């Protein structure tokens, strides 16, 4: 079951902060909408994802995928960390090991990041927060 799904827009990695263990995946403003769609992923341990997604759907990974990722790539599953699957519109599936993620709409400039900020309530609208 998808936690987040937007298969009609292009998303790309915009920023990564190893000191904050965060990654920002953004769908930039377009002629069809005047806001970015930012996906801020926190507590990032491992990533096996491309830099650009043609559409994006985020779910919790299947049990069969988790075993392979734990054994081959050192992914961790604890009460805090989970394995997310990221699927593009072509059906290709990628994986990310992290704690949680949030989806925001904002009007930040293309070079302006939304990770590592302390003014989260001021920079955009929180659409979804997943930390279950």
Regions found by a protein language model. Give the residues of each.
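Surface-exposed, interaction-prone regions used to assemble/regulate multi-protein complexes
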Residues: 1-132
